């Protein structure tokens, strides 16, 4: 994490794991949307209709809000019933139980930004109650293998048996400890960013990363050049904010799955940094504690919001020519539109569609060397409760904290399907693996 630099011509290169410089020449939920409902409405609904029905009525009001809608797939906070919003009727429908419940539960969890479904079951609406929902959707089981969203494979039906699907998704994006608020560019504290990990090669911190689960880490592809591909020399450190903390949990690396479209790995002379994304599969699973927790992915179709202030964290250099931070740093920076970031005063058309910029036009606070691969997270409540989502991966930039040269990030929402496919396809792989 860097303060403003003294070298206006400097680039984010470095001898360890620098961010490479580029070459020269139907309504979606938004990252960090925050639904707001008056306490009077909530209290009235709870009193008049009961908690179950009120919860869905409240969610319906939020989803229909013109400003900050909830996501159209939700889990009931009471009994984990999976429900989908019917925009035509303006109501929630349950998913009729089928032989494909496991796959449907997995698709629903993934669509909401959870990594996977941990369990599923079914309930009878006649005994469990409708709880504010109205009717059913049935699943076209033949379309499931290619479906990316539940809406791709569901239609209104009668569901004669009256049995509906429930699901338990892997929890994510929530702190387990109460924390104080810190405003950018300062030391962090234990438990604030429990998904942040340190990737170290021969004991040296080279990159950051984000826990998606106890055994999968998302980071940047450029952290693994040819010189750093002996996986037995990599270690992943989690559960600490001080780089020398004796309390950190460390594990080895079984496999690295990197994007086959990351061009510098094909030809080192290429300076085009699209697809700068990689998954690290750990040799075993980390214990999840109040200091070690996974982050959520963006929900399917979730868009970035220009101007939204989110948080980047890392142990990178505090200045371009400075030393790496000994304590995890955090900074709140706003998302900059690609139109602005591609203007001649900024990066002049070097920002590709699957990238985005974040920072202040005047500079002053930014990610830097050693922050590469680390998380850019945004908080929202589109899943009914406040969660942090991994919206970006620290990728590249010119200098550190320079005016009109903000940090550039891999746009995670554009790689959701790549992530899910890589995890399912390469869970038993070892070594360096390419995923198209």
Curated annotation (Swiss-Prot):
Single GO MF annotation: serine-type exopeptidase activity
Catalyses which reaction(s): Cleavage after basic amino-acid residues, with Arg strongly preferred to Lys
Predominant location category: membrane
EC number: 3.4.21.106
Catalytic site positions: 222 (charge relay system), 276 (charge relay system), 372 (charge relay system)
Keyword Transcription: no
Extracellular side: 60-436
Segments of this protein annotated with the region Disordered: 1-29
GO cellular component labels: apical plasma membrane; cell surface; cell-cell junction; cytoplasm; endoplasmic reticulum membrane; extracellular region; neuronal cell body; plasma membrane
Record key words, sorted: Cell membrane, Disulfide bond, Glycoprotein, Hydrolase, Membrane, Protease, Secreted, Serine protease, Signal-anchor, Transmembrane, Transmembrane helix
Membrane topology: Single-pass type II membrane protein
A Pfam family per the record: Trypsin
Xref: SUPFAM superfamilies: SRCR-like, Trypsin-like serine proteases
Domain annotation SRCR: ranges: 73-170
Gene Ontology biological process: basement membrane disassembly; cholesterol homeostasis; cochlea morphogenesis; detection of mechanical stimulus involved in sensory perception of sound; epithelium development; negative regulation of apoptotic process; negative regulation of epithelial cell proliferation; negative regulation of epithelial to mesenchymal transition
Function: Serine protease that cleaves extracellular substrates, and contributes to the proteolytic processing of growth factors, such as HGF and MST1/HGFL. Plays a role in cell growth and maintenance of cell morphology. Plays a role in the proteolytic processing of ACE2. Mediates the proteolytic cleavage of urinary UMOD that is required for UMOD polymerization.
Family note: Belongs to the peptidase S1 family.
PANTHER family found in the cross-reference section: ACROSIN-RELATED (PTHR24252), HYALIN (PTHR24252:SF7)
This protein's name: Serine protease hepsin
Taxonomic source organism: Mus musculus (Mouse)
């Amino acid at each position: 994490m860097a303060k403003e630099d003294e070298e206006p011509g400097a680039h984010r290169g470095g001898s360890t794991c620098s961010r490479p410089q580029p070459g020269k020449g139907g309504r979606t939920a938004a990252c960090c949307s925050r639904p707001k409902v008056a306490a009077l409405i909530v209290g009235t609904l709870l009193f008049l209709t009961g908690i179950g029905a009120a919860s869905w009525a409240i969610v319906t009001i939020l989803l229909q809000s013109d400003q900050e809608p909830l996501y159209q797939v939700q889990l009931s906070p009471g009994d984990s019933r999976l429900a989908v919003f019917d925009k035509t009727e303006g109501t929630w429908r349950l998913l009729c139980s089928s032989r494909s419940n496991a796959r449907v539960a997995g698709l629903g969890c993934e669509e909401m930004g959870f990594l996977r479904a941990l369990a599923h079951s079914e309930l009878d609406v006649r005994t469990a109650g409708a709880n504010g929902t109205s009717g059913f959707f049935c699943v076209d089981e033949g379309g499931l293998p290619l479906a990316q969203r539940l809406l791709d494979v569901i239609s209104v039906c009668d569901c004669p048996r009256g049995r509906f699907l429930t699901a338990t998704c892997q929890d994510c994006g929530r702190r387990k400890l109460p924390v104080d608020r810190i405003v950018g560019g300062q030391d962090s504290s234990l438990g604030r960013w429990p998904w942040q990990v340190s990737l170290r090669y021969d004991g040296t911190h080279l990159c950051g990363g984000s826990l998606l689960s106890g055994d999968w880490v998302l980071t940047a592809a450029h952290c693994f050049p040819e010189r750093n591909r002996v996986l037995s020399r990599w270690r992943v450190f989690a559960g600490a904010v001080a780089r020398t903390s004796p309390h950190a949990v460390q594990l080895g690396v079984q496999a690295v799955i990197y994007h086959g479209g990351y061009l510098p790995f094909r030809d080192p002379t290429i300076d085009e940094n699209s697809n700068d994304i990689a998954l690290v599969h750990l040799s075993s699973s980390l214990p999840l504690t109040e200091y070690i927790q996974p982050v959520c992915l963006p929900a399917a179709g979730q868009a970035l919001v220009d101007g939204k202030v989110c948080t980047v964290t890392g142990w990178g250099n505090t200045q371009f020519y400075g030393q790496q931070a000994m304590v995890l740093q955090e900074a709140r920076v706003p998302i900059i539109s690609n139109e602005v970031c591609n203007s001649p005063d900024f990066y002049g058309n070097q920002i590709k569609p699957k990238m985005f910029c974040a920072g202040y036009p005047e500079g002053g606070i930014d990610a830097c060397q050693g922050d590469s691969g680390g998380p850019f997270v945004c908080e929202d409540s589109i899943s009914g409760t406040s969660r942090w989502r991994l919206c970006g991966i620290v990728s590249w930039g010119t200098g550190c904290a320079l005016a009109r040269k903000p940090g550039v990030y891999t746009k995670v929402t554009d790689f959701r399907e790549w992530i899910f496919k890589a995890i399912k396809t390469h869970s038993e792989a070892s070594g360096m693996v390419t995923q198209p």
